[in-house]
């Protein structure tokens, strides 16, 4: 046994030495743990990537009394036929076993049919489509399969937060270009007001540029890139022989007056583009974690190599159910009841409600043209953040304060920025509106009570 001496200090008392007895095995264990921690520290490829906005803010929203407009998941019900197809699949014995590693045959066939119509070209279900563990898995496959250490990858700011760490884990260098808002002169502020400078974008291309990551409709802004903007990007990709990884998970969620254009359909782009889609966003089933990549066989085969040596395959009954759900809506694509048509109509009403609500309490929302998020400038609320961590950006402090004191949560927009750009976005927070009316009612109550306290 080992003896150690400590001093006990208490208010109003003189300190006295006390003896603590430690077992030698405990001391040895502590020393061994310290050595092990030093020896088996993190791999360099994940250095500095341990902070994650979803881990941090999902914990805050776990309190059932908090109205959660933060993380982007629906609390509305998915279509009944989607759930019914999953139930059917679960009762078919061979649907509970492994399926084809690159995508369940019925699902890749359905995706080939759907996107063949959209692209107006034949898409080989086995060679030009890869089903992965969500859009995250599709992004990971794309970056690991196509990007080398030392390559540069262009990312527009703000960006979905996993882009930068995935690029860094591949040993590549992210090169950032900001989307900037045009002056609005007090008029309605929309995601269309945010764009890039074509000359500035061209200046980011170099001999080291391997790829550009595009996100349309955009998260968090809700921007739907115009054909003209996409043509600028496409021309630069062709000129500099650059890949395009196009994250289009919100492709069906586009609102009145706007059209989603796939950059892969522009001249010279099919052969250099990986387009990523999501079952979670298409059918409001984010917990299914199914995504897909579509592109030419000479690119998809490298993504397949990553997948076969990592995720290997995705859940068979989920893929089988998704295939059947797609066939139901493929057959009625011109029908208002088709979920690809009915969901954006439903969400546009919710979006407009959120815009009115945010305006009514003195906030300045950026009206999204697509997706299911709305950003608002919260600086006018004048919240007292003195009890928050002073080292954090304003939006982090604000959301934590709002969650604690108002029982309403959102996501800080600076989480979607590189370190240099964070100060330009830290007065903005992102709200999710793919929620039941009762959830939005509760949020409205909180905002109205808050506003009445100010006046």
From Swiss-Prot:
Catalytic activity: L-kynurenine + 2-oxoglutarate = kynurenate + L-glutamate + H2O; L-kynurenine + glyoxylate = kynurenate + glycine + H2O; 3-hydroxy-L-kynurenine + glyoxylate = xanthurenate + glycine + H2O; an S-substituted L-cysteine + H2O = a thiol + pyruvate + NH4(+)
Source organism superkingdom: Eukaryota
Entry-linked CDD domains: AAT_like
Modified residues (N6-(pyridoxal phosphate)lysine): 281
Notes on temperature effects: Optimum temperature is 60 degrees Celsius.
Positions of post-translational N6-acetyllysine modification: 117
Keyword Acetylation: yes
GO cellular component: mitochondrion
Cofactor(s) the record lists: pyridoxal 5'-phosphate
Listed pathway(s): Amino-acid degradation; L-kynurenine degradation; kynurenate from L-kynurenine: step 1/2
Binding-site residues, substrate: 72, 219, 430
EC number in record: 2.6.1.7, 4.4.1.13, 2.6.1.63
pH dependence: Optimum pH is 9.
GO terms of molecular function: cysteine-S-conjugate beta-lyase activity; kynurenine-glyoxylate transaminase activity; kynurenine-oxoglutarate transaminase activity; protein homodimerization activity; pyridoxal phosphate binding
Regulation: Kynurenine transamination is competitively inhibited by cysteine, glutamine, histidine, methionine, leucine, or phenylalanine.
InterPro entries, per the entry: Aminotransferase_I/II_large, Kynurenine-oxoglutarate_AT, PyrdxlP-dep_Trfase, PyrdxlP-dep_Trfase_major, PyrdxlP-dep_Trfase_small
Pfam family, one: Aminotran_1_2
Quaternary structure (record): Homodimer.
Function as written in the Swiss-Prot or TrEMBL entry: Catalyzes the irreversible transamination of the L-tryptophan metabolite L-kynurenine to form kynurenic acid (KA), an intermediate in the tryptophan catabolic pathway which is also a broad spectrum antagonist of the three ionotropic excitatory amino acid receptors among others. May catalyze the beta-elimination of S-conjugates and Se-conjugates of L-(seleno)cysteine, resulting in the cleavage of the C-S or C-Se bond.
Homology family: Belongs to the class-I pyridoxal-phosphate-dependent aminotransferase family.
Protein name: Kynurenine--oxoglutarate transaminase 3
Species name: Mus musculus
Gene: Kyat3
């Amino acid at each position: 046994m080992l003896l150690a001496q400590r001093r006990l200090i208490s208010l109003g008392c003189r300190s006295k030495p006390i003896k603590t007895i430690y077992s030698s095995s405990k001391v040895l264990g502590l020393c061994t743990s310290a050595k092990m921690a030093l020896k088996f520290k993190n791999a360099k490829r994940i250095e500095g990537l341990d902070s994650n906005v979803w881990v941090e803010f999902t914990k805050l929203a776990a309190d059932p009394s908090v109205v959660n407009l933060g993380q982007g998941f629906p609390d509305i019900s998915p279509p009944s036929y989607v759930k019914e197809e999953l139930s059917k699949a679960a009762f078919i014995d061979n649907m509970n076993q492994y399926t084809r590693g690159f995508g369940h045959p019925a699902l890749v066939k359905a995706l080939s049919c759907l996107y063949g119509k959209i692209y107006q070209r034949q898409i080989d279900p086995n060679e030009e489509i890869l089903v992965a563990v969500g859009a995250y898995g599709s992004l990971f496959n794309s970056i690991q399969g196509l990007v080398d250490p030392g390559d540069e990858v262009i990312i527009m700011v703000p960006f979905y937060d996993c882009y930068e760490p995935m690029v860094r884990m591949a040993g590549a260098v992210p090169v950032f270009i900001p989307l900037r808002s045009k002056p609005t002169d007090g008029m309605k502020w929309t995601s269309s007001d945010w764009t890039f400078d074509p000359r500035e974008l061209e200046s980011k291309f170099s001999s080291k540029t391997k790829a550009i990551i595009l996100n349309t409709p955009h998260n968090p802004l809700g921007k739907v890139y115009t054909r003209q903007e996409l043509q600028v990007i496409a021309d630069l990709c062709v000129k500099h022989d650059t890949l395009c990884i196009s994250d289009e998970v919100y492709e069906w969620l586009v609102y009145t007056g706007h059209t989603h254009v796939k950059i892969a359909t522009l001249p010279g782009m099919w052969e250099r583009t990986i387009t990523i889609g999501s079952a979670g966003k298409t059918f409001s089933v984010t917990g299914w974690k199914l995504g897909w990549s579509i592109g030419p066989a000479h690119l998809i085969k490298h993504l397949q190599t990553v997948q076969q040596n990592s995720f290997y395959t995705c859940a068979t009954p989920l893929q089988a159910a998704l295939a059947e759900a797609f066939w139901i809506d493929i057959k009625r694509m011109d029908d208002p009841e088709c979920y690809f048509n009915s969901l954006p109509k439903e969400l546009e009403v919710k979006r407009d409600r959120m815009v009115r609500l945010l305006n009514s309490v003195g906030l300045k929302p950026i009206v999204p043209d697509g997706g299911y998020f709305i950003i608002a400038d919260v600086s006018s609320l004048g919240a007292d953040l003195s009890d928050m961590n002073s080292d954090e950006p304003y939006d982090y402090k604000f959301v934590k304060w709002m969650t604690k004191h108002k029982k309403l949560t959102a996501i800080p927009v600076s989480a979607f920025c590189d370190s240099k750009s964070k100060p330009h976005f830290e007065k903005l927070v992102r709200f999710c509106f793919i929620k039941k009316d009762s959830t939005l009612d509760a949020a409205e109550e909180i905002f109205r009570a808050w506003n009445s306290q100010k006046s």
